[in-house]
Regions:
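Solvent-exposed loop/turn segments connecting transmembrane beta-strands
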Residues: 25-34, 56-66, 90-97, 164-173, ...
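Flexible, glycine-rich linker and terminal segments associated
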Residues: 1-12, 120-155, 159-168, 182-187, ...
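Residue-identity detector for threonine
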Residues: 33, 49, 54, 64, ...
């Protein structure tokens, strides 16, 4: 089986690797994004871990690298998982850069996450002559795990991104709504984004998750009470890995994008 072969190779050659996936993201009016992501344990701590998360995204011949470090700790008889993380994001074609920080609270019934993004790079000119500027921003996300045997979740998120230049008033605010489901080694997600810049769109992704043998859990009992979430210790941080930019044309018109 493909997953077992990849898992065996990773465990033999990368002992610290705890999670690995390959993903295809689809969004209306944009070309697809292909990505690979891994979570690697740096150090075990009491009822927790210190870890590294690395991902590489390819969108429209544009690559973005995300390198993050975080800590997670299990509390309350392993029914609550708290975490904090920090990231550095680098987009290669225009050399956009930013840093980010996040916190998370994870249970068997619901999860809450918050992320902040701070642009480091200034104005850049892309290959079409358009000026781009990485944006500052934040997002909040809540996931509810449906009380059924299948691994199905619904989520809602809010976000705000803005041009950090003091002379600019450009801002993107909005919400995302969606659901995801785990089917064997595949994770399927779909939803809708609604924002204030007429950039509303449907989105979806399909992710192939390599089975390392630590993420399987029986969900057939205690569906409405808090249960052990130690199986989520190495799940990836949920954040926006592509760098949002504001695009400024020669006429002065502005638009958001990646």
């Amino acid at each position: 089986q493909l997953s077992e072969s990849i898992s065996s190779f990773a465990q033999e050659n990368f002992e610290s690797m705890k999670y690995l996936d390959f993903s295809l993201d689809l969004q209306e009016k944009l070309k697809p994004t292909f990505s690979i992501m891994s979570v690697n344990e740096i150090m075990k701590i009491d009822s927790g871990t210190i870890f590294n998360q690395t991902s590489l995204n390819n969108h429209d011949s544009d690559q973005t690298l995300n390198i993050g470090f975080g800590s997670r700790k299990l509390l309350n008889d392993n029914t609550l998982l708290l975490g904090a993380n920090t990231f550095f994001d680098h987009q290669f074609s225009e050399n956009h850069q930013r840093v980010g920080a996040g916190v998370e609270a994870i249970t068997s019934i619901f999860d809450v996450r918050a992320n902040y993004y701070n642009a480091l790079s200034g104005r850049k000119t892309n290959d079409t002559g358009t000026i781009e500027r990485a944006m500052d921003g934040w997002d909040l996300r809540a996931d509810y795990h449906l009380p059924i045997k299948q691994d199905v979740n619904i989520f809602v998120s809010a976000f705000e991104f803005e041009n950090p230049e003091s002379a600019s008033s450009y801002k993107e605010t909005g919400n995302k709504y969606g659901a995801d489901a785990k089917l064997g080694n595949f994770l399927l997600e779909g939803g809708y984004q609604d924002d204030n810049q007429a950039n509303d769109y449907w989105f979806g992704n399909i992710t192939y998750v390599v089975n390392f043998g630590s993420g399987e859990k029986d969900t057939s009992s205690n569906l409405t009470s808090l249960t052990d979430v130690s199986d989520k210790l190495y799940q990836p941080v949920k954040r926006e890995n592509k760098i949002r930019v504001v695009k400024i044309s020669a006429s002065g018109l502005v638009a958001g994008g990646f």
